[in-house]
Structures are given as C-alpha cells and as structure tokens.
Amino acid sequence: MGSVTGAVLKTLLLLSTQNWNRVEAGNSYDCDDPLVSALPQASFSSSSELSSSHGPGFARLNRRDGAGGWSPLVSNKYQWLQIDLGERMEVTAVATQGGYGSSNWVTSYLLMFSDSGWNWKQYRQEDSIWGFSGNANADSVVYYRLQPSIKARFLRFIPLEWNPKGRIGMRIEVFGCAYRSEVVDLDGKSSLLYRFDQKSLSPIKDIISLKFKTMQSDGILLHREGPNGDHITLQLRRARLFLLINSGEAKLPSTSTLVNLTLGSLLDDQHWHSVLIQRLGKQVNFTVDEHRHHFHARGEFNLMNLDYEISFGGIPAPGKSVSFPHRNFHGCLENLYYNGVDIIDLAKQQKPQIIAMGNVSFSCSQPQSMPVTFLSSRSYLALPDFSGEEEVSATFQFRTWNKAGLLLFSELQLISGGILLFLSDGKLKSNLYQPGKLPSDITAGVELNDGQWHSVSLSAKKNHLSVAVDGQMASAAPLLGPEQIYSGGTYYFGGCPDKSFGSKCKSPLGGFQGCMRLISISGKVVDLISVQQGSLGNFSDLQIDSCGISDRCLPNYCEHGGECSQSWSTFHCNCTNTGYRGATCHNSIYEQSCEAYKHRGNTSGFYYIDSDGSGPLEPFLLYCNMTETAWTIIQHNGSDLTRVRNTNPENPYAGFFEYVASMEQLQATINRAEHCEQEFTYYCKKSRLVNKQDGTPLSWWVGRTNETQTYWGGSSPDLQKCTCGLEGNCIDSQYYCNCDADRNEWTNDTGLLAYKEHLPVTKIVITDTGRLHSEAAYKLGPLLCQGDRSFWNSASFDTEASYLHFPTFHGELSADVSFFFKTTASSGVFLENLGIADFIRIELRSPTVVTFSFDVGNGPFEISVQSPTHFNDNQWHHVRVERNMKEASLQVDQLTPKTQPAPADGHVLLQLNSQLFVGGTATRQRGFLGCIRSLQLNGMTLDLEERAQVTPEVQPGCRGHCSSYGKLCRNGGKCRERPIGFFCDCTFSAYTGPFCSNEISAYFGSGSSVIYNFQENYLLSKNSSSHAASFHGDMKLSREMIKFSFRTTRTPSLLLFVSSFYKEYLSVIIAKNGSLQIRYKLNKYQEPDVVNFDFKNMADGQLHHIMINREEGVVFIEIDDNRRRQVHLSSGTEFSAVKSLVLGRILEHSDVDQDTALAGAQGFTGCLSAVQLSHVAPLKAALHPSHPDPVTVTGHVTESSCMAQPGTDATSRERTHSFADHSGTIDDREPLANAIKSDSAVIGGLIAVVIFILLCITAIAVRIYQQKRLYKRSEAKRSENVDSAEAVLKSELNIQNAVNENQKEYFF
C-alpha cells in the first residue's frame, strides 16, 4: 500500500511540476505575437552602420525600407544589432533574413539578452550550443523556437559568420508576449516575514516558487523553523543553492533527519534564476533553472513541527536551529509564491500578514558592473596609463576554471623590466623581473580556479611590491635596486598581443580564459564602453559587457560516480575507483557474468560482476565456480543453521536474508542467467509446514517478488509439495512433506528452489514450534545461477534484404553498442537507427574495415578501424562503439581503438525516431549476411532469437563457436559445439577442467604403482573409436609422444615403464647418481639404447618436465624446456604389441636391463603429474575414471599437486573453492586464491584418526565427525555458541537418521 501511495504522490508532484513549467514558459500557442515590427525607430541600435540607409532601424523582417536591412561599417565578430522591447517581455521565438536583394546575410549568430542594456547573457540551446544557424540567402526566413523562452527587455544579435562573398546583413523579428513581473529589492539587511493562518496550511503539501538575481555569492533566500529544531532553509553559498532540511532534533543530527541538496552554479551573475520547491508527503522536488532533483525524504519529514511563519531574504530573529554561518540576501526577488500566495503583492499592499524589515523597495536596482570575457588563450586587453605617478597599481576581479594563465603584465618606465601577475596551479603569483637580477616572487591564494569571483590588488612603489587576494594581503617583497618606479606604461590584461606589434609583454604560462570586471588602473575605473567603441586601448578576442563562463560540470556528465573537473573549454572525468572507464566513466571494466569470464579463459575465483554493463547498477563481488558450466555463487547472511522454538501463528518467527548485492543487482543477474537455484533444508521435530485439517500454511518463504510462497525445495509453484512428495517416498505417505507427519523425532525436507522468477529467498516465516517438544531448524544455501542468456543470444541473417527491427534506441547523451559478428561476406550493415537529421550506423565497409558513422546535428562523422587481417573469416569478432558528450569511439577485437573528439560547444543530443534496424537498413539494401550475437545497447541485451523466430529470412541462433573459441581448449582438449556455446572435451588429455587446463597429479608412496593394461583396454574398446584401441597387440607402434612432470628426492627411481608382449620396452629412470636415463629397447635381441642426461641431479626435489617424441628411429627429448637432445636408435624403429604402462614400482621385472630392474624394484616416491602417452592418460584413468578403464593401483597413490614446494604438504598450493566460504585478498580482474590452507585439513585428519583409535567409534560417528570438521572449516568465522548448537543438532540428526534412508546428507 505504501508503494502505491508513493507512486500516486510522485505522479501528483510530476503533474504540478508540469503545470509550473507551463506557467513559467508561457503558453506557446498564446505567446507568439510579433514584438519588433511595431517598435519605434529608437528601439533599434547597433555597433555601427555602413550608411544611413543601412541603419539598425531598417532591420525589420520582410521590410524593404532603406537599403533593405542593417549592415555594419565593418564586417567582423565585434558587430551587433540590438533591440529594446520597452519592458521585460517573454520571447519564445526569433526569425532572421539577409539584406533585401543583396549578397549580405549572416550564416550563424549569437543571441544575447539583458534587462538593463548591459551585463549581457548568451542564450544557449541544449545547455551547450551557443550559436544559431542563420541564412543561406538574402530573402528566406529562418525561424527558431526558444526552449526555454527568454524573459528580458533587451536582445542583441551578434553575427559570427556571414556570406564570404558579401558582408553582414540582417533583418529580424522576435515573437512572444507580455511578461508579468512582481519584484522586491533587498539590500542585504532587509527581509520579508510572512505569517499565515494555521487553517490555510496543508500538513503534507508545500509549493514555493520564486526568481532571484544577485551579484553576491552568499545569502539566505528563505527560512522556516520550528521550536524543536525542525527547519527548512534555502541558502545561496558560493553561488550555489543549498536546500537544507532538518526534520529532527538539531542537537542530535542524523542521516535520517538531515537533507542537504545542492543545485545550480555561478548564480551570482546578476541574471534571473528560477527556483521551485515542491513537497508532497515525503516526495520532494527541488528545481533550479532547468536542473531538477527529486528525492524521497526519510524520517518524520511529513510531520515536521514548524512555526506558522516563513522569512524571505534573511533570518529576522536569532534562529533557534541555525548553527551554520549565514548572511542576508542582497539582490532582487521576482514572482515569489508560497502555496499559491503572491508574497510580493501582499507586501506591496502592506497586508498585515507581511512584515517588511529593513529597506525594502519594489523595483529592481541594476548595478552597472561591466564584465569582459577572455574567450581564448589569444585574448588580451591592452590599456594605457597616463597618470605618470610614482607607482604601478591596478585592481580587478576575475573568475575562471583554468589553473594557469596570465592576468596582468606591465612594463616598467625609465628602467627595463616588468611586473607579471599570473595563475599557476590555481595560485596567484606575482613576479617582478629586471635584466641581470634575480626575480622577486610573491605567491598568494589557493584554488583560485574555482569559478568564483576573486579580487586582486597590485601595488609597486619605490622599492616595495605588494599583492592582495580577496582582501588578504600577501607577503610584500622588496624591489631590487634603488631605481624609482613610474607608471605610464601599458597594462596587458589576460594575455599578450602578437610579437609583431613590438610589445615586450611576457606570458610564461599562456593566456587567461575567464572573466574580469571592476578593472582600475592607478585608482581610476576603466571605461569598457570606450574600449568597445575603439577610443581607449586595444583588445583581441574579447566579449565586452558579458561574462561567458559556464559550469560544464552542471549537470555532471561523468557517470557512475566519476568526479568532474573542468577548464574553460571542456570537462574531464576522473574514473578512479569507480569500476568504469572511458571519457565519461561509461564503460564497465568488469564482465557481466561468470560465463563471460569463463570464455576469457579465467578459472574459479572471486570476480566483480556488472550485470547491466554500462547501466546504472553498480558492480558487486561474487564467486564464479568454473566447472563445465560457469556457476555464479551469491552469498547471504543466513548461511548458519538456525534453530527455532516457541512460535505460533500469533507469535511467528521471521528470518531475513541479506545478500552481498542489492535486489536490483540480484534481479539483473537472475534475469540474465539460464537457470538459478537455492537449496533449502528444513529440519523439524513436531513442526509442520502445512496444517492438514484446513490446508493453512504454517511456514512459508518470501522471494524477490515480495509474495508469499508455500511450495518447498524440489517442487514447483503450482504444487505445494516437498521433494519426497514428488518422489513418493515421504516417511508418511499421507503427506507430501516429511515434516507434515508431525513426528516427535528429527527429520527434514530438503530440496532445490529453482523457479528463478521467485528467487532469491529473502524471508522465512515459521509458526509451528510452540507445542511441547516442538522445534525446527533451517539452513538456506547460497543463490546459484548458471549460464548467460545474453552471451549466446544470436541470429543468422540469410539475405541482404533481411533484418530485425526493434524500438528506437534512446542514447541522447551517452550511447554504447556492443556485439559479436562472424561472416564470409565482404560488407554489410550491422545496425542502423535514423532520426529527422541525426543517425547512427555500424557497418562492415570492406573485408578489413569496420565503420561507425553518426550525426548529432554537427554534420556526419565517420570512425573506421582497419585490420591487417580479414574480418570475413567466419570467426567471431567483437565490436564496441560509444558516443558521449566528449567523444565517439570504435574498437574491434583487440585492435587499437579509434576516437573522434566532439566539436567544442556543438550539438550534443542524439535524437532518433525510427525503428532500430539490426542486420540491415530501412532501404533493405546493403544488409548483413552472417551471424550477430550478444547485441547490447547501453548495457541492455536485445533478444535477437525471440525476434528472429517470427521474422522471415532470419534464423535464431548461430553455430560454429569452436572456430573462435577452440583455442581456449588446451593440452590436447577438443572443442565441441553445443546448441548454445561450446565445451572442451578432455577425454584424450591428461588434464581436466572446463578448458583442460587443470593438471592431474598424484603422490606415490613407497612401493606404490599405477598399471595401465593396453591389451585389456582393447578388449573393452575394440568396437569404439577410442584412441587407446590403436595400441592393440596386432598393431605396430612406429611413433609416440610422452609427456609428464615429476618431483622426487629418491634414487634410483623408475618414473615410467612401457612394455610389450615381445619383450620390448621403454623405461625412464633416475639412476643412483641422480641422472636421468631414457632406455629404448625395440628389439628383444639387442641391448637397449640409453640416453643419459647427467648435467644435474634430477632428484633434487624440484619439479621437472619431460617430453619424449619418437618418430620411428629418431627420438627428440626435451628436459625442463631448456635441455634438448635428438638421438637415433639402433635397436629398432617399431614398438610391437604394447602390453602395459607402469608408473612407480614394477611388479614383474624380468627381461629388462639391470639398471631398469634396480629402479623398478625401488619404484617411485614423490609426485607425478600430467602423464600422457599419446592419447592415454594413466593418472586420469586411475584418479578420475569415466568408464571401466583397465587400471590397477597398488600401494598409497593419492591425488595431490606437484606444484607444492619440498617440505610442505603437496596440496597446499591447490586452489580450494568452497560454496560456503571464500576468503582472501581480492583482485579486480583475477580470481582470489582461497585462504583456507590444507594445513587445517591435515591437522583435522590427524585428529580424526586419533579419535577413531581412542574411542573406536562407529562408521556413523566418523561421518558425523567429518561433517562437523568440514562445516567448521567452511564456517570458521562463526561464534562458538552457534558452532556448539549446530553440532548438537547435527549429532541428533545423523544418529537418528542412520536408519532413515530419507535423510539427505547436506554439507559442503
């Protein structure tokens, strides 16, 4: 019910916001009157005019008066045409023409607006586009609707480009309507206090709207408080708006009672900014200009105890709850409404509800501060000083985002040298230099590139130099030498002119980009209007009477928590520690599933998973168990066995499960998986799951759908049964669950919950443990998921005219597309989506070129990646494209990515409206022939297979994965196709695992052996295709490949022995002196050929690798990858009737040479690994039998790892992956080696033996102990009390169930 109420409130908020926006913007159908045509001639002005007949008064649209339009005297970017609308109006559209019947027209222009005729502001589209496209001829009309509209009195058109064969020429019209404005001017000491009737106040709803403008960066706009510390405050701080809400005791702040929201930036620009605050219950909208923040307040927000008064512009009395520093607002407020009440109108009428404190006026004063914008690093302002005083002094204010740049340079008169004032790393530095003398430096301020206004004062007099920043005097420095300093030189602000002008100006760190104002030289304020008109000083690339700074980090286009920083012309994203990369932190560095990690060749371990790729969900850590199928294992906090007593329907027990991921992350992971399951075990003693009399559930569980579920493990939602009920083997056939038999003894119902739409389990409720001797216990396993529906989702396109279509792709500001393809065609379009003018297209342009082309309004761009090899090789290739605010990029496979920077201040919105075509185009031409797989757009997978099933000439699925992924199968493993994906067949490999990369090793104790009998194998497999059948006695073996590794310290030792029925043999031994010997006897009438490697002691306890490759009489031998030898046999070229292969001790050793016999009698003690003779792997056959292999094992042979160092347990280096406990350090990309070492296993084993010997317990007790030991190892962090309780319960369960066949043994 709460969620429904929240949704309703949110909808009402949205509707009220839309209504407010309509009021703010005006009704577009009623606000489109022409505003220029009826204006008097005096309303038009310009920078200059070519002649009296080209004056600004002739610039009316469609008029032919005079010369047919306005043209300036000189065509350059400093010209402008200005319109005075007489009063503030709402302007909703503009239209332009060129000069009538001429070659004079403007092709692009800026539109600026102002209330006072100075301090102009540029109008921007899409929050970044400053320029309007103009005309292509003299007479056609180009019309633009302004969204949002402009509220201003003055408009100024500034031509940027014009017809290169003519000059600037303009005729214009603007459209709009009258604008209602009620204003109040507050001087920084005054405020308004509104007291309202309690009856008129809604307890759950508040709407406050206003506009403000100011030159101050700090001030209180509104404040309302209560007696207990509750308050709502809207405060301007550092030119940003903060909404502060405290809904609890101010002395005890907490995250549930404090709200601190920030919106807006650079709000002290003396231009109007709109604010809207809407509260409906706990739903709050906070809007500043076009930026909106919606949030759901926590705590008792809708029950705030506030007084029945609200102040605007300040806090009139000492606040009972305000502990933060604050000052009153200095500026103007407009159209101030509180819950529909016009506050300014009430104040004008001097109504008793309004108390005006201080000097309050109802007209807005216009401070005549004229800023100047330095647009580029080439900008400068050169001003003369004619005062001739014995002092060099200047003051000014500046604001910028750049860390470095020249602020001021002045030459010294009568003596050579100069004074430099510049920014370096955000600090202000002053430098006075004279030739032949060391410079005198002063450093002041920090982080002065924060976009705020900063004041600077410079003074150099006699032998003293001082600098002040924001009123703080920096350390003064004595000047070098007794020379007197005189003013009268030229002051260069912001940069230096070209050297061709003969200037001595120096700019060590480049020019300044930013704004300056209030410039004074020798105590006299500089008249910038005179500068603009050319009568004072000189300048280049300036915008006078306007500050064009903008905050490129608002809104923050850095995604996924990336930190935004900026300079004058661009922004940068720091993606450190976000888990994402790219220009805007859009691309996840993690895979989306364990399946994807597996097909990169990764082994079992911990990995970060990003289920929705570049989508909003954060990555999270889980465990991937890489078996033949990749299993995703997600843990929760309820893995302990939990006992429950003393519950009933009136007093139920509820257990909650919290997972390592959020519910949204879990849902994305589950939806992506092919299959998910959770094992649930319910132990019971007189505790039922269902009341048989009325069918009422006595226990139930809840999943992610928040619905009650009464089916149990092994069953499905439509059958309220347990596993035994489905299998028909419950302990009481009258019931469908063991626990429903209600017996006074422990039993259980265990099974898998596998209906993934209901998973994971989030809650368990138990109500039937309140009777005598009644008790229950439960244990929930981790969430296990396998497969990836998206990774293999694919479609095959049969003709060039075939395609799949999907809804329009929405990636206005940030878009990424990724997919796999394979083809034999030389070209074809993978994907295309069109708009009215915008589009994106990805295609195979030629066999070696993939191209990404797009247009977002700045003209078409293309990015191509060329490969040295062909893409149409029928192998899978991966394509990823991205387009964002900063750049577009294309990467194919592992080739170097290609990028295309976005144009500065260009169009940014990708606006598409057609269907998305996959595998073809709307024209049904240049379609793609081949397969496309795993197509994702902004992290969301398109279901190609589902759409292909209903589309002609397109087939669901693709085959031929082994051509691309076969290389993942190692050590002789063979890639086999599956309907979805592939697998590695390790049948004829000495290795195992999903990629045949896990070596099979064994520790051989003294006197032990493994014997593989080929003749018996032939009898078993002569009708099969087994490669072992090739060793039949009737066959002659002219070649073999032998590989293995070993570690030992014993001599002599027999490593490997192969014999035949004709007394031929091959032996690999370590002689008494530690040398390795390989003996071939391929003719029973000759002595064996002996190859001796005596370069080192091979029984040194280190791991050694042996490879023997025989081709008839030539044998190639390699030892440890660095010792190689080739020998020619004299005893024969064929191995006839192979009998057996022996590892370790030879039980029958007649007819062999003495050294082999001695080594064979001794056998082998140590570790052997990955033993393979051609396609026979004897250790694998012995330790991992898949069918009745003819293998005999004698003595102590145990699976181990040869990677262990001497003196340690042979298994201590093995990776152990337990579902219940995965601990250790975490690497972002590679698996985590488990910290559970086998030392504990060895100790546990010894303890088990001691207990067995001392107590002589039964086999059942041994199993109980093993369960307890394994459980203890997997749950090492559990408290002793929990361990004890579980051990007792397990003992009860196992002793009782030793005679109960229905008891399921469950442990990891």
Swiss-Prot record:
<keyword id="KW-1015">Disulfide bond</keyword>
<feature type="disulfide bond">
    <location>
        <begin position="575"/>
        <end position="585"/>
    </location>
</feature>
<keyword id="KW-0732">Signal</keyword>
<dbReference type="InterPro" id="IPR013320">
    <property type="entry name" value="ConA-like_dom_sf"/>
</dbReference>
<dbReference type="Pfam" id="PF02210">
    <property type="entry name" value="Laminin_G_2"/>
</dbReference>
<feature type="disulfide bond">
    <location>
        <begin position="962"/>
        <end position="975"/>
    </location>
</feature>
<keyword id="KW-1133">Transmembrane helix</keyword>
<dbReference type="GO" id="GO:0042995">
    <property type="term" value="C:cell projection"/>
</dbReference>
<feature type="domain" description="Fibrinogen C-terminal">
    <location>
        <begin position="587"/>
        <end position="792"/>
    </location>
</feature>
<feature type="disulfide bond">
    <location>
        <begin position="1167"/>
        <end position="1202"/>
    </location>
</feature>
<comment type="similarity">
    <text>Belongs to the neurexin family.</text>
</comment>
<keyword id="KW-0245">EGF-like domain</keyword>
<keyword id="KW-0770">Synapse</keyword>
<feature type="topological domain" description="Cytoplasmic">
    <location>
        <begin position="1263"/>
        <end position="1308"/>
    </location>
</feature>
<feature type="glycosylation site" description="N-linked (GlcNAc...) asparagine">
    <location>
        <position position="748"/>
    </location>
</feature>
<feature type="topological domain" description="Extracellular">
    <location>
        <begin position="26"/>
        <end position="1241"/>
    </location>
</feature>
<feature type="domain" description="Laminin G-like 4">
    <location>
        <begin position="1046"/>
        <end position="1202"/>
    </location>
</feature>
<keyword id="KW-0130">Cell adhesion</keyword>
<feature type="transmembrane region" description="Helical">
    <location>
        <begin position="1242"/>
        <end position="1262"/>
    </location>
</feature>
<keyword id="KW-0325">Glycoprotein</keyword>
<feature type="disulfide bond">
    <location>
        <begin position="931"/>
        <end position="958"/>
    </location>
</feature>
<feature type="glycosylation site" description="N-linked (GlcNAc...) asparagine">
    <location>
        <position position="359"/>
    </location>
</feature>
<feature type="glycosylation site" description="N-linked (GlcNAc...) asparagine">
    <location>
        <position position="602"/>
    </location>
</feature>
<feature type="glycosylation site" description="N-linked (GlcNAc...) asparagine">
    <location>
        <position position="1073"/>
    </location>
</feature>
<dbReference type="InterPro" id="IPR002181">
    <property type="entry name" value="Fibrinogen_a/b/g_C_dom"/>
</dbReference>
<feature type="glycosylation site" description="N-linked (GlcNAc...) asparagine">
    <location>
        <position position="538"/>
    </location>
</feature>
<comment type="function">
    <text>Presynaptic protein involved in both dopaminergic synaptic transmission and GABAergic system, thereby participating in the structural maturation of inhibitory interneuron synapses. Involved in the dopaminergic synaptic transmission by attenuating dopamine release through a presynaptic mechanism. Also participates in the GABAergic system.</text>
</comment>
<feature type="disulfide bond">
    <location>
        <begin position="332"/>
        <end position="364"/>
    </location>
</feature>
<feature type="domain" description="Laminin G-like 2">
    <location>
        <begin position="398"/>
        <end position="547"/>
    </location>
</feature>
<feature type="glycosylation site" description="N-linked (GlcNAc...) asparagine">
    <location>
        <position position="1023"/>
    </location>
</feature>
<dbReference type="InterPro" id="IPR001791">
    <property type="entry name" value="Laminin_G"/>
</dbReference>
<keyword id="KW-0677">Repeat</keyword>
<feature type="signal peptide">
    <location>
        <begin position="1"/>
        <end position="25"/>
    </location>
</feature>
<keyword id="KW-0472">Membrane</keyword>
<feature type="glycosylation site" description="N-linked (GlcNAc...) asparagine">
    <location>
        <position position="574"/>
    </location>
</feature>
<protein>
    <recommendedName>
        <fullName>Contactin-associated protein-like 4</fullName>
    </recommendedName>
</protein>
<feature type="glycosylation site" description="N-linked (GlcNAc...) asparagine">
    <location>
        <position position="625"/>
    </location>
</feature>
<dbReference type="GO" id="GO:0032225">
    <property type="term" value="P:regulation of synaptic transmission, dopaminergic"/>
</dbReference>
<feature type="disulfide bond">
    <location>
        <begin position="553"/>
        <end position="564"/>
    </location>
</feature>
<feature type="domain" description="EGF-like 1">
    <location>
        <begin position="549"/>
        <end position="586"/>
    </location>
</feature>
<feature type="domain" description="F5/8 type C">
    <location>
        <begin position="31"/>
        <end position="177"/>
    </location>
</feature>
<feature type="domain" description="Laminin G-like 1">
    <location>
        <begin position="212"/>
        <end position="364"/>
    </location>
</feature>
